[in-house]
């Protein structure tokens, strides 16, 4: 039961206003080195569908009442932290030359000093439509079943600096998960039993596996 509650707190994407204990990093290197800038308040709100269409499908908009800080958060900050929650600024990210656009996406610390971003599909080879997911991993999967958003999201690895402007986000697809599960034959077979490639890329499938492997946890 405790494990289900932990999973729910990790993966449910909510709408709230952040007050206190909020900080941000200006770069990936700052994140790796744990160099955070503390601020008083930031507002985190779910973006409307129309806003996503015109400026990128990222789920969140983070703002500050102070104009100078608001500009930093919108254009310069790399990642924002509020309590145990992380949000990565998609303005700095791309995949296959396609920009993610404005706004923030939910993220989790991955394997210590990397980030696992939960977002829509992006890239030259990705369609805009989302695949549903019918397969779950027992009790672990049950903890995230209520969160339908995860069915329509995929996971990306953010693990290195860029050429100075944009960072490349790596899709956690079947090849990626094959490497992750290379030494875990049983879990690999269970993962491959999920019907359809798009479903195997769903965050609802990927996240419970990463948790079980100890690659993600609460920040």
Roles of regions detected by a PLM:
Residues 1-25:
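Bacterial Sec-dependent N-terminal signal peptides
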Residues 9-17, 30, 35, 46, ...:
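Generic low-complexity, intrinsically disordered sequence content enriched
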Residues 13, 33, 51, 205-206, ...:
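Intrinsically disordered regions, especially transient/low-confidence alpha-helical propensity segments
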Residues 180-219:
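C-terminal partner/receptor-binding element of secreted or periplasmic proteins
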Residues 23-187:
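Aromatic-patch recognition
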């Amino acid at each position: 039961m405790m494990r289900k509650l932990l999973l729910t707190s990790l993966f449910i994407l909510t709408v709230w206003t952040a007050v206190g204990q909020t900080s941000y990093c200006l770069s990936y290197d700052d994140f790796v080195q744990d160099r955070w800038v503390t601020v008083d308040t930031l507002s985190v709100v779910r973006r409307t569908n129309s806003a996503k269409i015109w400026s990128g499908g990222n789920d969140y908009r983070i703002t500050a009442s102070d104009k100078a800080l608001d500009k930093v958060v919108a254009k310069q900050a790399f990642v924002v932290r509020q309590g145990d929650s992380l949000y990565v600024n998609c303005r700095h990210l791309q995949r296959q030359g396609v920009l993610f656009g404005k706004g923030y996406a939910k993220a989790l610390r991955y394997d210590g000093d990397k980030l696992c971003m939960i977002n829509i599909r992006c890239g030259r080879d990705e369609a805009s439509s989302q695949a549903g997911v019918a397969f779950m991993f027992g009790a672990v999967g049950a903890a995230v079943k209520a969160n339908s958003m995860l069915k329509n999201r995929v996971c990306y690895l953010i693990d290195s600096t860029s050429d100075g402007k944009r960072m490349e986000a790596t899709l956690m697809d079947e090849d990626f998960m094959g490497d992750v599960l290379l030494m875990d034959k049983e879990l690999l077979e269970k993962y491959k039993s999920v019907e359809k490639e798009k479903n195997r890329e769903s965050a609802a499938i990927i996240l419970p596996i990463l948790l079980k492997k100890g690659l993600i946890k609460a920040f």
